[in-house]
Amino acid sequence: MRNTRTTITLSAATVLAAGTAVLMPGVAQARPSAVACNETALVVAVTAANAAGGGTVTLTPGCTYTLTASHGNDGVNGPAGLPVITAPITLEGNANTITRAGTASAFRIAQVGTTGGLTLKAVTLSGGHAAASGHNNGGGILNFGAVTLTGSHLSGNTADGLGGALSSTGTASAATLTSSTVKNNTAQQGAGIASVNGTLTLTSSVVNANAATVNPGGIYYAAGSATLNTSTVTANTPTNCTASPSPVPGCIG
């Protein structure tokens, strides 16, 4: 236990020295100042949280973090703007946006590994583009672990494969959206969300105005479980959920 605490404390000190702020699990700390409003500070903070086994990264209120390059690649699934999430990490936002620069090469915003968890609170992810040959799912987020959105938004992301905003894949994968929106994303199929063999739960959330080349445009669901609680899937093209490999309970059109 003593060694674990030492490692986390040193990681926290490293992060603070870099001008960023991370709350590490299991260590008593005063709430730190927010991560500086720039790409480097955000990448350093996420890297430190991964190394510490998880943590909360507090973002500068109202800041748009613009990613100009990929900072994550597991060598299999193509590039991601943020370091691959390998531990439970919360991005604590306040009207924040994390976006790919329009002049940057194609990469999704985030990838969550099987051991990882990404929680977004009041954060928008936009501009991600999954285009790697054969690994082009999840323009906003590619998830193999756990993704939780609370009061957050996925918009303007593109996947050349499945899941323009979010692709969640594998029996261990879980995607939970509460009071969140998935809008104006594009993909080959499932321009809003693609969930394959995992658990998908939407509560008081909206999947709207997403456009796919092939049905369905809103939610692509294949096995696992899907639950819509007081949520709407509307105005997606060509369809909302029709032609999904498995029916999406409560989704019409």
Predicted regions and their residues:
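Extracellular/surface-exposed low-complexity segments
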Residues: 12, 19-20, 26, 228-253
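The right-handed parallel beta-helix/beta-solenoid scaffold, focusing on the short coil/turn
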Residues: 55, 63, 80, 87-89, ...
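Extracellular beta-strand/beta-solenoid scaffold signature
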Residues: 76-80, 103-111, 133-142, 159-169, ...
